[in-house]
């Protein structure tokens, strides 16, 4: 087995059978949903970290002409197997559960200065570790290194775009759903932040919290169309240009670190549609030595070690844990 195939090995959960496999997929979906709520953090990063990224992309890609033909002929059993139905349902239920349960809590946490620092510190540790663990699976060369740099620059530019306040027409909501879901399945580029840039984040989060169905359904339809279209492109790239594609995705994650750096200072603000202040421009600053700083660093370290621990459970070749813990 060559290095590339060894690096790409992962536990196949496309057809879960045991309760533990279903639970793992549900919790993976929950982690993805929780991540996607936070502007600057990507659910795609969580999928990468937890080893289901390629399986997810291929499962979404399976909604094709063959799936339509099976549906028309009422071959339900074959259809459900073809589209990895059990995998998608378990993952999707976890994701939706996180969105419904955590939308209000994470929204409140993001509005609290201390809570935002702690939340971003934890996710900073997660993303930093994922750069190391996923990057270790790439066969590095001049081409892949250049791909990494391009990905990092693109992500850095995107996360530094100043958010706007947009209209909320059905067409705009539909397109926003398409763009956001595309970002969500790209590690490092946050779907929530794309909604923030387009001026839709507060509106959609409020709609979810208040169970306002029309805008939720419109955004959801856009997301379905967007993810079906983009998954085909990404699946092709992973199959044909695996190392280059993963290097770009790792670059996306690296470029996003600027956005989720925990300690920031607001340079310019404005009132949102609720009359609350919203920061339009900010800069990263050095933290003050305090109890909050110590707790934030602790959460950062926990996030960092958690990702490396989960990666080692899957591959036994984690660059951090493999020297201190060799599993049988």
Task: Please annotate each region the language model reported.
Residues 2-37, 45-186, 190-328:
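Multi-pass membrane proteins that catalyze or facilitate reactions on polyprenyl-/lipid-phosphate substrates
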């Amino acid at each position: 087995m060559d290095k590339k195939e060894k690096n790409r090995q992962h536990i196949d959960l496309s057809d879960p059978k045991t309760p533990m496999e279903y639970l793992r997929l549900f919790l993976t979906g929950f982690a993805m949903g929780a991540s996607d709520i936070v502007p600057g953090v990507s659910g795609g990063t969580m999928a990468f970290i937890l080893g289901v990224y390629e399986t997810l992309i291929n499962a979404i890609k399976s909604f094709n002409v063959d799936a339509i033909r099976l549906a028309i002929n009422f071959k339900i059993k074959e259809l459900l197997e073809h589209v990895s139905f059990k995998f998608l349902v378990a993952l999707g239920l976890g994701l939706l559960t996180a969105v419904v349960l955590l939308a209000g809590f994470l929204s409140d946490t993001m509005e609290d200065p201390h809570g935002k620092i702690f939340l971003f510190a934890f996710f900073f540790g997660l993303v930093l570790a994922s750069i190391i663990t996923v990057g270790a699976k790439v066969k590095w060369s001049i081409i892949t290194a250049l791909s990494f740099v391009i990905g990092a620059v693109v992500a850095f530019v995107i996360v530094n775009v100043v958010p706007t306040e947009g209209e909320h027409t059905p067409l705009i909501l539909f397109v926003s759903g398409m763009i956001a879901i595309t970002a969500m399945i790209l590690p490092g580029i946050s779907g929530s932040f794309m909604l923030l840039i387009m001026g839709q984040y507060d509106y959609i989060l409020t709609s979810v919290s208040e169970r306002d169905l029309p805008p939720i359904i419109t955004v959801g339809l856009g997301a379905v169309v967007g993810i079906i279209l983009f998954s085909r492109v990404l699946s092709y790239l992973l199959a044909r240009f695996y190392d280059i594609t993963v290097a770009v995705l790792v670059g996306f994650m690296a470029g996003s670190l600027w956005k989720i750096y925990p300690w920031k200072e607001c340079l310019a603000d404005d009132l949102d549609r609720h009359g609350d202040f919203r920061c339009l421009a900010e800069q990263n600053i050095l933290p003050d030595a305090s109890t909050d700083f110590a707790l934030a660093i602790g959460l950062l370290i926990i996030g960092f070690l958690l990702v490396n621990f989960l990666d080692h459970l899957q591959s036994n070749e984690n660059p951090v844990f493999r020297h201190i813990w060799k599993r049988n």
